[in-house]
């Protein structure tokens, strides 16, 4: 029995649960940049098939932005989370605590670089090296929360997923052994 069959409806509901959780947690009051979307994009890339991997974080962002309101830099934010899905896909062959932590850190850095470079293109900062530097310096206080949330939510999401997978593997082994005894 395959893992997805053993997980049954739980695995099928995973994308929808992630979308709902991501949107709700992003809308709920929280400190700036302390949201689960980066970790959700990582997990989606690591465990969901093809289009679902990208659809989950984009749908969570779109749902929450429909409530919160879209903003000038949204294309940069969406692009950064789609890129984080690609980082998550590098975890597919082997997910370890160290690899998940490294992917979470890389995701935080990528989000910081992409979104702040995009912010620099806007009207707030002069389009000079001094303006670029001012933009990145102003963003440093927010980077801490991005890093903390990506690490904490990644450990939580991957831990929950791996625990559920372990339970499903045991269930599949029991069902397989029971089917084998009856034949």
Residue ranges and their predicted role:
Residues 16, 31-43, 75-83, 117, ...:
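Membrane-embedded alpha-helical segments of multi-pass membrane proteins
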Residues 24-35, 59-91, 95:
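Interfacial aromatic-anchored transmembrane helix boundaries in multi-pass membrane proteins
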Residues 1-46, 52-55:
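Hydrophobic transmembrane alpha-helices
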Residues 24-25, 44-51, 87-95, 160-168:
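Structural signal for the C-terminal ends of transmembrane alpha-helices
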Residues 53-64, 100-108:
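Central hydrophobic cores of alpha-helical transmembrane segments
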Residues 1-9, 165-183:
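Membrane-interfacial, low-structure loops and terminal tails that flank and connect transmembrane helices
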Residues 96-177:
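Membrane-embedded alpha-helical hairpins and interfacial helices in multi-pass inner-membrane proteins
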Residues 4-5, 90-100:
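Membrane-interface helix-boundary motifs at transmembrane edges
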């Amino acid at each position: 029995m395959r893992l997805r069959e053993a997980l049954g409806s739980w695995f099928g509901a995973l994308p929808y649960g992630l979308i709902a959780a991501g949107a709700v947690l992003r809308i709920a009051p929280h400190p700036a940049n302390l949201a689960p979307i980066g970790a959700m994009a990582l997990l989606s890339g690591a465990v969901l098939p093809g289009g679902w991997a990208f659809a989950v974080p984009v749908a969570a962002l779109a749902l929450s932005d429909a409530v919160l309101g879209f903003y000038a830099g949204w294309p940069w934010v969406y692009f950064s989370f789609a890129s984080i899905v690609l980082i998550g896909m590098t975890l597919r062959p082997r997910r370890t605590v160290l690899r998940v932590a490294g992917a979470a850190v890389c995701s935080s850095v990528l989000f910081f670089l992409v979104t702040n470079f995009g912010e620099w293109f806007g009207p707030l900062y002069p389009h000079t090296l001094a303006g670029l530097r001012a933009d990145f310096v102003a963003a440093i206080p927010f980077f801490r929360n991005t890093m903390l949330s990506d690490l904490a939510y990644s450990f939580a999401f991957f831990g929950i997923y791996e625990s559920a997978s372990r339970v499903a593997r045991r269930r599949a082994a029991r069902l397989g052994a029971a089917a084998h005894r009856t034949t």
